[in-house]
């Protein structure tokens, strides 16, 4: 029951943030949406969008990790915000910025899925599929392909015929 409460809390946090961003997008207040995303980045990890895009993904993961454990709540929020940021850049006709946001978001979602198979309940897998669609015109970097391969290795068909995942050691 505690795990379900945790997952619901994550979903509520992400949902609230997205609702505000979607509102700004609908009224075409793109700068307002980007400012909100930047503020949420600062609240979550103590750094704004510019800093998050300037650091390596390894550094970002280190910022979201405590004692070797990825903070899934923060990682999920950051990944979702990066995807929303990419959508805004795409709406503004800035494909280079959209690509960077989408790619970092995709890699974070993949890391999340590889860390905790319980988060499939939040439809994180559909986020990955959506991002892969947005990035299909690009050749994915080797690290992203490695993460995808690891995820595909973890996928299996359960005895009841449903699709499931299991986590394998990545070290």
Task: Give the residues covered by each predicted segment.
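N-terminal alpha-helical interaction modules that lie
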Residues: 1-78, 82-92, 99, 103-113, ...
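Alpha-helical adaptor scaffolds
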Residues: 107-153
